[in-house]
A protein has these predicted regions:
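Conserved N-terminal catalytic core of the sugar/cofactor nucleotidyltransferase
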Residues: 2-5, 15-20, 28-114, 118-120, ...
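N-terminal beta1-alpha1 ligand-phosphate binding loop
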Residues: 11
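Conserved core of the sugar-phosphate nucleotidyltransferase
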Residues: 121-149
């Protein structure tokens, strides 16, 4: 499954913890057995635990690339926006990146979601496999090109 995670915003809603320099998705606020993890670490972990073969690409601004690599490692796919232009241009650029750089075909399903949702593990355990089956059924029947959840 091809997944685009949107992580381009400045994320000031957790002010004073977050600001233009330190976006909310990188603040380690979720307690784990090993310490704390950030929103981006949590959603990435949840996706890869449920679907180890998921191809995850993070759409982000150039100011956040080092934070993403610092928290997720250098092997995660990153599509860098030259400047922040809001959600639709970020999705358009990321899908062009999937097509041109990663070789994703125009008929392959792509899931787009933000990096800052709060999803319990039990929701991930059933949601991602259902979404995978659902997208494959659309892909096999060619019913639609996109969906929003």
């Amino acid at each position: 499954m091809n997944i685009i995670l949107l992580s381009g915003g400045s994320g000031k809603r957790l002010w004073p913890l977050s600001n233009d320099i330190r976006s909310k998705q990188f603040i380690k606020i979720f307690k784990t057995a090993d310490g704390y993890e950030s929103m981006v670490q949590r959603v990435y972990r949840q996706i890869t635990e449920v679907d180890k073969d998921a191809s995850v690409t993070i759409a982000t601004s150039k100011t956040q690339v080092s934070a993403i690599h610092n928290q997720l490692g250098d092997s995660v796919g990153v599509c860098v926006e030259p400047c922040r232009r809001d959600t639709f241009p970020a999705i358009a650029l990321a899908t062009a990146y999937l097509h041109d750089v990663k070789g994703v075909g125009p008929d392959e399903p792509v899931v787009v979601c933000p990096v800052d949702p709060y999803v319990n593990k039990c929701n991930c355990d059933w949601l991602l496999p259902c979404l995978h089956r659902w997208l494959n059924s659309f892909y096999n029947n060619r019913c639609t090109k996109y969906c929003t959840i």
